[in-house]
Amino acid sequence: MIIAQNKTNYQDLLKTLAVIAMTIDHIGLYLYPELTIMRIIGRIAMPVFCFFAGYNFYDKPKTRIIIYGVILQIYTTILFKQFLTTNILISIYLGQCYIYYFRNSITSFFYNGFCHVAVMIILWYISWTLIDYGTLVIAIMILGFIAQHEKTNLKLCCFIAIFTSIVHSTFFTLLIPLSDFNFSNTDLILNLTFLTITYILMILSDYSQKILINIKWISRNVIYIYCIQIIILQFIFIYKYTYGFKNW
């Protein structure tokens, strides 16, 4: 099923909420790192975006995603004068490539798709330092792709996507204390609460259900919103917290 192009729907609402969460997360990361609540709210963005990146994938990998991802990565590398973990656009493009080449295997039998998910979750451990969220992005995209082709498994796919996101945050907190997700026990409870609400919202209504508020201009321009806010916030971060551009 391809979502109607000219009508705002429930999927647009979910993605708009994810955009808001993403914006709060990025502001917290670059400007207010002491406010962990902003990072906690931001944890709902990745599973929603990646799930729908897989759910809506039906053709070939989108070249514009990797182009914007590479340009943004070059900008970040020049700005920080070092190579950092690649941005999530590159992760999503790799996910599209993976689904494209393994699409028949993923959808040929119910358990095949979940085997692919399991492999990607396992590979996360050796990939998270290279690409944003590691292969967890690909795993959640596969879940979205399965949900599109196996509607009866949508709730299960959403549950696994949210559950792995909870485990991801908890793992970083417990085992990698210097990570961006160094949450307290209270923070982890809040994280669990927000992600549980996200799961409920993801299974609450049909994604194609029409809504009255026109928010397509937000939900269908996520790539541009992401790139613009990263460019601006990283620039402010460098200018505010380092020597700025005096030594360039």
Swiss-Prot record:
Top-level taxon of origin:
Bacteria
Instruction: List membrane-spanning regions.
Output: 65-85, 105-125, 126-146, 156-176, 188-208, 222-242
What is a single cellular component term in the Gene Ontology annotation?
plasma membrane
Q: Does the keyword ATP-binding apply?
A: no
Q: Taking the first listed entry, what is the main subcellular location of this protein, grouped into a coarse class?
A: membrane
The topology of this chain with respect to the membrane is: Multi-pass membrane protein
Q: Which InterPro entries match?
A: TraX
Subcellular location(s) of the protein: Cell membrane
Q: Which UniProt keywords apply?
A: Cell membrane, Membrane, Transmembrane, Transmembrane helix
UniProt protein name: Uncharacterized protein RP591
Source organism (scientific name)? Rickettsia prowazekii (strain Madrid E)
Q: What is the lineage of its organism?
A: Bacteria, Pseudomonadati, Pseudomonadota, Alphaproteobacteria, Rickettsiales
